[in-house]
Amino acid sequence: MSKKLTFQEIILTLQQFWNEQGCLLMQAYDTEKGAGTMSPYTFLRAIGPEPWNAAYVEPSRRPADGRYGENPNRLYQHHQFQVVMKPSPSNIQELYLESLERLGINPLEHDIRFVEDNWENPSTGSAGLGWEVWLDGMEITQFTYFQQVGGLATGPVTSEVTYSLERLASYIQEVDSVYDIEWADGVKYGEIFIQPEYEHSKYSFEVSDQDMLLENFTKFEKEAERALEEGLVHPAFDYVLKCSHTFNLLDARGAVSVTERAGYIARIRNLARVVAKTFVAERKKLGFPLLDEATRAELLKEDAE
């Protein structure tokens, strides 16, 4: 590797590469979530017949993974670079390897392995065939072909590539701690994020109000249901995301038992499934506007028969 890219140069390089492949460059969605997959730019757009190619950075919050800024690799919040392509290009794996080359990682000079790791997200009723991508022994990417999202079978096939930006940057910059990553020239990751990491960890494990969180979960759940009754998919999905984050805070606090945990996950999943079905129905009412004319006419004709 000739040049050690900064964290933001890694993002810019990936954005430029996937822009060249026809992806829309979206911005991070403004509601807390545990993974880039839970953004509406993936969760909603992976279902239904319309094509969709997008790439975006997604800050992902996982309260139970917080370590007060003391662990070099475990974080309350990390950053994913998410790529979703529907229909999946036949050469998606080759494109991924080419993206690594853009980052200065020559696949011929490194041990890059696709290790089978089928993916499932029980709280959203989603699953797919997947692989972890290991670079010289370090997992840097999750690669998935969605089979089901929100309880609905996907078609056409959607591929998702999720880069772990902190791990990738640690490898490229040859540092052992994420806090030593150069975000930009002269500015380290820790100078930006170590204090929020400490504070969010303290809040998640010690300070959060369990009764308030339990009450909010129920309120968010009811508001999602109310929005769905009005056919308002996107506001409803925002409240599903709020339910998910609230549950994650409760889980980190140890406020839910094993039995209760399964119940909360089922409640989130049931909402996510209704959101998914309603989204496809609403897109159909609009005539699936992202489809080309011939495909749209054929599909709507089949549905009418």
Swiss-Prot record:
InterPro entries assigned to the protein according to its UniProt record, in alphabetical order: aa-tRNA-synth_II/BPL/LPL, Gly-tRNA-synth_heterodimer, Gly-tRNA_ligase_asu
Keywords from the UniProt entry: Aminoacyl-tRNA synthetase, ATP-binding, Cytoplasm, Ligase, Nucleotide-binding, Protein biosynthesis
GO molecular function: ATP binding; catalytic activity, acting on a protein; glycine-tRNA ligase activity; transferase activity
EC number, as in UniProt: 6.1.1.14
Record's catalysed reaction(s): tRNA(Gly) + glycine + ATP = glycyl-tRNA(Gly) + AMP + diphosphate
EC class name: ligase
Gene Ontology terms: cellular component: cytosol
UniProt cross-references to SUPFAM superfamilies, sorted A to Z: Class II aaRS and biotin synthetases
Main location: cytoplasm
Highest taxon in the source lineage: Bacteria
NCBIfam families linked to this entry: glyQ, PRK09348.1
Family, similarity comment: Belongs to the class-II aminoacyl-tRNA synthetase family.
Protein name listed in UniProt: Glycine--tRNA ligase alpha subunit
Organism: Streptococcus suis (strain 05ZYH33)
